[in-house]
Amino acid sequence: MAHDRPETHKSGCPCCSPYIWEAYQLRHPGLSRRGFFGAGAALTAAGLALLGGRKDAAAGGLATALAFTAPAFAAGETRRSRLDAAEGITVYRGGTIRTMNPSAPLAEAVAVSGGRILAAGSEADVAARAGRDAKLVDLNGRTMMPGFIDCHGHISMTALLMGFQNLAPEPAGPIRSIEDIKSELRKFRERTGGGRGGWILGAMYDDSLLAEKRALTRADLDDVSMDQPVLAYHASLHVVVVNSAALSLLGISADTPDPKGGVIRRWPGTREPNGILEEGAITLAMPRLPQASREELLDLLDEVQSRYAAWGITTAQDGATRRPDFDLLSLAAERDRLKIDVVAYPFFTHIEDLARGDIEMQRDYNGFKVGGIKLMLDGSPQAKTAWLTKPYEVVPPGFDKEYRGYRIVDDETAASMVDDAFARGWQVYAHCNGDAAADQFIAAIDKATKKHGPGDRRATVIHAQTLREDQLDHMARLGVMPSYFVTHTFYWGDWHRDSVLGAERASRISPVRTTIDRGMRYSLHNDSPVVPSDCRMLLWSAVNRQTRSGKVLGEEHRISAEEALRGITIDAAYQHFEDDIKGSIEAGKLADLVITEQDPVRIPPDELRNLTIAETIKRGETIFQA
């Protein structure tokens, strides 16, 4: 049946909608507001005190001889205590050190002290700075790089969904068919002793990859249970599916109207709900979902950080942060439970909280800070809710052939929010998957720039899937960065080509090559929990642009491994206004480092996704070791 299209859409994924995030608030109420940590100044000062120019190598000749004739540490002996990281000096040598510093891209050795990089360069120069008592770590031919930065994602939402059964398709999960989904949901009931708060919960199923090639419905979930409510999130997080017991519990029936900005899908030719709740209709389910405790969420956050560290990530992002998420992350920082740094970009509905100082904007932090604000201007292409200038290749059921997705806010509202951010000196991100949404954001930036004058604002187009060449030209003039969700080429490339955008537009998604050709800075991200925050997949996807079926999508937009590394190191740090302390291996910067068994620049491009992470180091301390 046909559905009226609302003028503006409120999508249901963490990167494009208030709806799922309202669910998160319901999941952990009562979290008190925590201030940012102000501790750590002494550690930083200690590191900075060691800086100052490179000393003459001749003056340290004896130290050089003594230091580099000492026995090397074995790979298994590289884990250091907090005391060693804070007070000792450690020298790494004996491998490939890719600094990501364009003026000195390779180094022979790196010295680390007080959580900072003391020196990087030749063995002789580094040994002179480090002195005879420095600890030596032999890289044994491995490769050291700056720690990876996944500069757009939703780490708090990722933690929440860790408590759901994984319904993702391979390689992120075990699902190939609807029968697999049923089996996994039954496993959830078994391992939780009957469900969580009576509910059976799963997330990240993707109907475009199911053997049955159809959407999940209440009938499928009724096979899991007729007595307990069952809920499954779609991979886009724009849709949930519930069973008959859940519909009854939620009071959703044939008489229930579609809520504003959402759709209750019905069985063909009837008004009877089929269990699929889209966009704004998701909010009908949220108040009845079980709530996670503060301690449960902290434990889940610990687990997520361990995964990030195992992927070489030392800085992550919490995009579209809500107040409960801010409180959770602040609490984690206060309890010293952040292994990695987290930069938050509160949802635009919290502009007033920021203006009042209820949520503090600051550049300095101890593990957690607020970096700016995030606007949501459209939805997602895989769910066909991204706002495009031309119709979808295959329109969703119930919409006319000119369907192009939805805007979230009107032009005046978008311009007003950007103007407010400029006036207050806040960095602004905007979620723009569709080129129409990008047009809206670029126009708002242009208008605000004319009013407030040029400046180093680093406004960023998040996802940037369908940016046109003329838009890149305009962005370059305005100093606007794109941050590409480049793994779309693998996860949904075939879907985009065959159903979402058509062959021509699909070949141009994530146009990183022409971005580089313009001399623009850019970043690459995974948008977790939409896909796992594995930066190796970012490298592999950007370099190969290969779909699940093995087809190359837009060969002309392939980039080199070195260029891809920029997008998760120095340029990603630049996006966060942190390129002065992160993103490259240079004296004075944080000792955020990753060691890999292979050199990503030298291995065959197809092996990038299998790059072996040997060790991840955060502020001089090992947080992961294989």
Predicted regions mapped to residue ranges:
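His/Asp/Glu-enriched, well-ordered alpha-helical/loop segment
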Residues: 418-429, 436-459, 463-464, 469-473, ...
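N-terminal secretory signal peptides
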Residues: 1-35
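C-terminal segment of N-terminal export signals and the immediately downstream linker at the start
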Residues: 30, 50-101
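N-terminal secretory signal peptides and thylakoid transit peptides that target proteins
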Residues: 23-44, 51-60
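Phosphate/diphosphate-binding loops
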Residues: 341-369, 458-464, 503-517
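Non-cysteine beta-strand/loop elements that form the S-adenosyl-L-methionine
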Residues: 368-384, 480-489
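Divalent metal-binding segments
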Residues: 82-93, 98, 102-356, 375-437, ...
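Acidic (Asp/Glu)-rich catalytic clusters
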Residues: 335, 361-364, 476
